[in-house]
């Protein structure tokens, strides 16, 4: 399984420097939508990393697909702080227990 990263240049640069090969630099919302659809169809991707704000800018249907996706597992970073709640909920959903309590 591979790690994929989607986002603007300033978000993906560090991942690219760390050696991640599946990096999709997307300057606008249509490019982000296209990259997300591509990654969702790619069975070799196990984890998708995106900026929380970019996920928030996606159409509702695509955002729902990301939230319900098991493979790839979507990790949202940065943004307004709601990303940690999202990660908490994903862990709770996967494990069945709230590990933060």
UniProtKB/Swiss-Prot annotation:
This organism has both a Na(+)-translocating F1F0 ATP synthase and this H(+)-translocating A1A0 ATP synthase. Signal peptide: none annotated. The keyword Flavoprotein does not apply. Optimum pH is 5.2 for ATP hydrolysis. Its main location: membrane. This is A-type ATP synthase subunit F. Disulfide bonds: none annotated. It is found in: Cell membrane. InterPro entries: ATPase_V1-cplx_f_g_su, ATPase_V1-cplx_fsu_bac/arc, ATPase_V1_fsu_sf. GO terms for molecular function: ATP binding; proton-transporting ATP synthase activity, rotational mechanism; proton-transporting ATPase activity, rotational mechanism. One of its GO terms (cellular component) is plasma membrane. Has multiple subunits, A(3), B(3), C, D, E, F, G, I and K(x); there may be a few other subunits as well. GO terms for biological process: proton motive force-driven plasma membrane ATP synthesis. SUPFAM superfamilies: AtpF-like. Belongs to the V-ATPase F subunit family. Gene3D superfamilies: ATPase, V1 complex, subunit F. It comes from Methanosarcina mazei (strain ATCC BAA-159 / DSM 3647 / Goe1 / Go1 / JCM 11833 / OCM 88). The keyword Chloroplast does not apply. It is a peripheral membrane protein. Component of the A-type ATP synthase that produces ATP from ADP in the presence of a proton gradient across the membrane. Keywords: ATP synthesis, Cell membrane, Hydrogen ion transport, Ion transport, Membrane, Transport. The gene is atpF.
